[in-house]
């Protein structure tokens, strides 16, 4: 979806496109630069897409997202997402649960039947800084192999602000910008 959006919009209709699976970045970008709100991708995050797929196949299931950032809790509380994602835990909270339950991972045996080898490297890389942009670039290569995309990645809200300031100054035209708060 984002690859098609980028190809259709940049630079013909807008100078650049912003993307991220980080709600903190998206909210910050839209608050600091409301004029850029339409430049920030509205594509659903993997958390929401996965939860919706689970709910479609198992309507009574409870979905739990476990990740590094508490900002995902804000995303899960959005009116349009509330019914999809039931709980969000940070890694720190999950480790606290394991600790309280006396679960020691170093003593657990791996079960080969539980191996999850169906995902792709691009899909697994979404949560890593620059991972969304890398997936978009890869998808663009399949759609339009001759199209070159310049990307910039900002890690931390301070660096994201700098990146957006450069975009506002017209120094990131044609770029795909990814931020991670």
Map each language-model feature to its residues.
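Iron-sulfur-associated redox domains of electron-transfer enzymes in respiratory
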Residues: 1-181
């Amino acid at each position: 979806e984002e690859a098609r959006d980028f190809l259709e919009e940049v630079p013909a209709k807008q100078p650049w496109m912003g993307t991220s699976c980080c709600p903190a970045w998206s909210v910050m970008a839209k608050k600091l630069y409301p004029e850029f709100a339409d430049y920030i991708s509205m594509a659903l995050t993997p958390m929401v897409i996965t939860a919706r797929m689970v709910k479609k196949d198992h309507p009574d299931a409870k979905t739990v997202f476990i990740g590094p950032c508490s900002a995902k809790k804000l995303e899960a509380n959005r009116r349009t997402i509330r019914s999809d994602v039931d709980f969000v835990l940070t890694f720190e909270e999950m480790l606290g649960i394991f600790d309280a339950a006396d679960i020691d991972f170093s003593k657990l045996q791996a079960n080969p039947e539980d191996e999850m080898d169906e995902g792709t490297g691009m899909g697994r890389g979404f949560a890593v800084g620059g991972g969304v942009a890398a997936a978009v670039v890869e998808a663009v290569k399949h759609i339009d192999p001759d199209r070159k995309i310049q990307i910039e990645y900002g890690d931390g809200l301070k660096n994201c602000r700098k990146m957006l300031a450069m975009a506002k100054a017209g120094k990131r035209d044609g770029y795909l910008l990814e931020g991670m708060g």
